[in-house]
């Protein structure tokens, strides 16, 4: 969490909105202290029912932001170049731009938890989801979003979808407005279980010298 906030600020974010749910009071107290300590403007947005799909968190956060924004999964860590490049990816044909990694067999990717991405010839998204059998890349968990993303999630819910972020992404993909940015050789990690937590402790200081001061 703190790493992601510091990275977003270094990528140029003027304000960081953190969506809270489980143990919200404890997290919000930590965020207030971090804001004082770091000088970063941090605003919590609480989702009352944290059991709902993650698209509801996107809508809650987007409601507090005017215009485009970097969207990051709280348990992901990114090399600085990923977010800095992603912040520059906007364009009139894009409702969202997703950072993707074509190294789908990397030891840093958890195949049991990954969200897979199938691409069109122009690099825009054709399909996205955890259950894809044919895919070209893995979703890195970092997006440059426009207001269209939250609108797409809301529209998907109206049409009967559960309300996941991928529901909204697929809707934008179907409209030809879900772009991608290939991260190339850059480093990132989804810290969702103990072995990846150990990898993060081992590798993050090497890849994030601006945070760890090495």
Where are these regions (language model features)?
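Short, hinge-like loop/turn segments at secondary-structure boundaries
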Residues: 33-36, 61-63, 87-90, 114-119, ...
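Conserved alpha/beta core of the MobA/IspD/sugar-nucleotide pyrophosphorylase nucleotidyltransferase superfamily
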Residues: 134-214
